[in-house]
Amino acid sequence: VAEEDLLPEPEEYSRNMELAFWSTEKHEQKRNGYPVVFRYQKASEIFREFQSMAAKRGHGASSFEMQANGQVVLFINGAGGAGSGTATAGCAAAMAAQGKNTVCFTLKQNACNDSFDICGSSMTDVMYEISMWRQLGGKDQGQLQMKLQSMLKQDNETEVYSFAPFDLPVSAMNFDAESVENLIQAIKGICERCVISADGTLSPMLLKLIRLADWTVIVSDSTAEGNEKSSKLLDSLEAIDSMDEKLIVGKMGVIFNRFGSTGQKLALPKYASELGTIPRYQNADKK
């Protein structure tokens, strides 16, 4: 990392190493084709940028596996349009505001990028990188962590790191349970909190997500129909849990979103706990 005026011929160095310039502008991305590193930030963030540069080069850098201590919160749509994506983004923003290094993304097939002003690479690109890593043997966990870290971007307002949604629903079709496990294990090594939004359609991928998550939250829209669909999902998970090994015990909660004067709560099974209601505001400025 160099001062620009002290390195008049950067191309002499960039052939053999990853080169970057110091910057005093927080949002500067490139200078004369070279990456920049913001000078006035925590040493840990500067180190993160070094890791990103090493991952982009893809060779000549020793990698190491970071300990997977991050905790995962999974939000599942109990019914279509229940607002689980908004609840996910709100949870991630709250955790980031507490000073936790937080990553947020959605695994929904047909989601749009409406939660954060700044997002990283799409989940389609993430899926491709995991696929390439597996083709190369899938052994070097540190290399995958560095690659994924380089694909994250931090939102200025909320300070949440995120990936953008899948480019097309067809991309998400090929994201299987093994890919999800690879993704979660890598992400848990580069953040303190990982907040994920997923469709409520039962699949091997969703069951793998629930097993890997520290907390799972079902989001209902507080209508009679939405509660019925959420109840069916909970009953299905209970049935799977009785046949499988402790899929849901002790970590399943329910949020009643858009709760107003006509809002309703479903009777929860004993293994699930109510986490509260999110009011339906009529005024946009209060939302």
Mark where each language-model region is.
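Structural motif
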Residues: V1-L6, W22-E25, Y40, I76-A79, ...
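Conserved catalytic-core segment of NTP-binding enzymes
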Residues: N182-R193, A198-P279
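P-loop/Walker-type NTP enzyme "switch/lid" segment
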Residues: L107-G189, D285-K286
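Extreme N-terminal, non-catalytic leader segments
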Residues: A2-E3, E12-V72
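Walker A/P-loop phosphate-binding motif and the immediately C-terminal alpha-helix
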Residues: N69-N110, S115, A186-I187
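Hydrophobic beta-strand segments of well-ordered beta-sheets in folded domains
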Residues: V1, R15-S23, Y34-P35, Q71-V73, ...
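A short acidic, often aromatic-flanked loop/helix-cap motif at beta-alpha or helix-coil junctions
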Residues: P8, H27-K30, Q41-I46, L168-V170, ...
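Short loop/helix-cap segments at secondary-structure boundaries that form the rim of catalytic
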Residues: P8-R15, E25-Y34, K208-I210, Q264-Y271
